[in-house]
């Protein structure tokens, strides 16, 4: 009889962190939400695609709202009570994601910052779409 492989499962260590930063990256195709502590260490994350939204539904404002709510529920397990918000990208889920943070109980928003990178006339942009 063959021996069984013994695998060590990674345990999720519950941290007790009161303050954090939520990074919302809203692209044209998806919305990614990452919650870190103030040093930048990742506590939890969520994306619209990971929640089961497929194709063009990932880029909707509703999918962005669900991704934020899922990430905040995970962060509350680690003791997060106060969040700063960093938003990046031109996606359609930006405003909805930020508004949904204000309606979640037990979370206080400390500050808001838009960190979308803007070129100082760098690379040439892609050609305009003609629909």
From Swiss-Prot:
Family designation: Belongs to the universal ribosomal protein uS11 family.
GO biological process, one term: translation
A Pfam family recorded for this sequence: Ribosomal_S11
Name of protein: Small ribosomal subunit protein uS11
Keyword Ribosomal protein: yes
Gene source species: Wolinella succinogenes (strain ATCC 29543 / DSM 1740 / CCUG 13145 / JCM 31913 / LMG 7466 / NCTC 11488 / FDC 602W) (Vibrio succinogenes)
PANTHER family hit by this protein: 40S RIBOSOMAL PROTEIN S14/30S RIBOSOMAL PROTEIN S11
Organism superkingdom: Bacteria
Oligomeric and partner information: Part of the 30S ribosomal subunit. Interacts with proteins S7 and S18. Binds to IF-3.
Cellular component GO terms held in the UniProt record: ribonucleoprotein complex; ribosome
């Amino acid at each position: 009889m063959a021996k069984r492989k013994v695998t060590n499962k990674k345990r999720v260590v519950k941290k007790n962190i009161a303050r954090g930063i939520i990074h919302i990256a809203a692209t044209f195709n998806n919305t990614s939400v990452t919650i870190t502590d103030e040093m930048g260490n990742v506590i939890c994350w969520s994306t619209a695609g990971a929640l089961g939204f497929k194709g063009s539904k990932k880029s909707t404002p509703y999918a962005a709202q669900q991704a934020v709510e899922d990430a905040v529920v995970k962060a509350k397990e680690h003791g997060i009570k106060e969040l700063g918000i960093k938003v990046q990208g031109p996606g359609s889920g930006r405003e909805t994601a930020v508004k949904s943070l204000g309606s979640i109980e037990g979370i206080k928003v400390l500050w808001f910052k838009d960190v979308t990178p803007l070129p100082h006339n760098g690379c040439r942009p892609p050609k305009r779409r003609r629909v």
